[in-house]
Amino acid sequence: RRTLTIIDTTSEMREIDLDRIGKRELLLGRNAEQCEVVLADPIISKVQGKFLMKKDSVAYEDQDSSNGTFVANMGENRLLSKKDGYVELSDKSVLRIGNIHQPDQMVLLLYRDSEETEKWKRQAFGSQPISIGRDGSNQIVLHSPGVSKVHCTICRQNGKMMLYDRNSVNGVLVNGQPVRGMTALRDKDLIQILDFQMFYTNGYIYYRSATSGISLYAKNINKIVGRGKKKKKILNNVNCEIRPNEFVAIIGGSGAGKTTLMSAISGFDKEFTGAVYCNGVNLIEQFHSLKSIIGFVPQQDIIYENLTLKRMLLYTAKLKMPKDTQRQEMEQRIHAVLKMVDLEEHQNTYIRKLSGGQKKRASIAVELLADPKLFFLDEPTSGLDPGTEKNLMMTLSKLSKEQNKTIVMVTHTTQNLHLCDKIIFMGPGGRLCF
């Protein structure tokens, strides 16, 4: 479902389902007789722009409008004009129309290509500060273990709206840039905490308490190892897109660069050229702010075998979850992840007594504690019998859809690839074949 969320100059919000219009080309503008997407605002040209609805994507072109269109897309911020032609939009791309120096006189459009789990909510500012965090006492509650109890506050100060980061574990981004202590907010600013997006406009915060998933886009990824005559390219101009909540397998022959690619797009290997965008934010540049939404399960299970499963998860929760997390919250999260991986009845079993498939599920449970939305696994089915492998693949597929996880795994086996939404096939020399 491809949608536009629009905030106009009066700070009113509305949502348009682009697919429901049912046309390949959609004009955006003030003229209701010509345009399918009508914005009755004087800042908008009669015909402002055009959306091109492709099978798997949407592109936008400015139609030589009076004010142009500012686009924030894949880490790029620029003013579009007719001569730029079509620009491919990614999930959570932001378009702004108007004078960039007068943001209160701008119209903002947020493009989404994934199904949202809930509608936008609106929080008005009064005389008291607004607090945002995990705890139920906040005015804006974000349901994620990675969000601090009180993550940040917003208040009026000397005629400005100021956002203060309250020493949160995972930080705050405003328009893609990390907040160092505090920052002044401008109208139509985009606030991001982990994978939660919020907008500030004219004394209101628009937000969602739950998120729909993470998109990932790899652009021109190249990696070279060795020196001199031993120099070798192991990733060769790889471009790929992974949509929110997709279950994706990376396959290919030995030495094709499967694990190398996964290490790059997960942010754990930063020594490559090109860029990786996580919900439109440069993953490498903002890795500190985004790392808590990433889970990584290595091929070798890293779990302590002389503990019961529940006790091992409790120790891990103390390491992975914010320091202000209460024991009761940890217990609730452990119960939830054991249910996700079908290990509830084994919570008091010593890990050494678990089967190979159960140990792999235990490793997955470890990473699920912090509720990562982007999940990577290296050869998760290696060494498992066919029946156990199929059950694990079914669990991963279910996690992607029911728990809003974007899951990427490297695998050699092909028996159960029909359970995946997408397959990335790597060939010799680190080339993307399919």
Stretches with model-predicted labels:
Residues I364-A365, L392:
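Hydrophobic anchor residue at the start of the ABC signature
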Residues E305-P322:
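Q-loop/switch helix immediately C-terminal to the Walker
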Residues L314, E329-H346:
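Conserved ABC ATPase "signature" region
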Residues F375-D378:
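Catalytic Walker B motif of ABC-type/P-loop ATPase nucleotide-binding domains
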Residues S266:
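Helix-to-loop junction immediately C-terminal to a conserved catalytic motif
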Residues L369-K373:
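A short, proline-enriched helix->beta-strand linker immediately N-terminal to the Walker B motif
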Residues R1-S66, N73, L79-P145:
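Intrinsically disordered, low-complexity acidic Ser/Thr-rich regulatory segments
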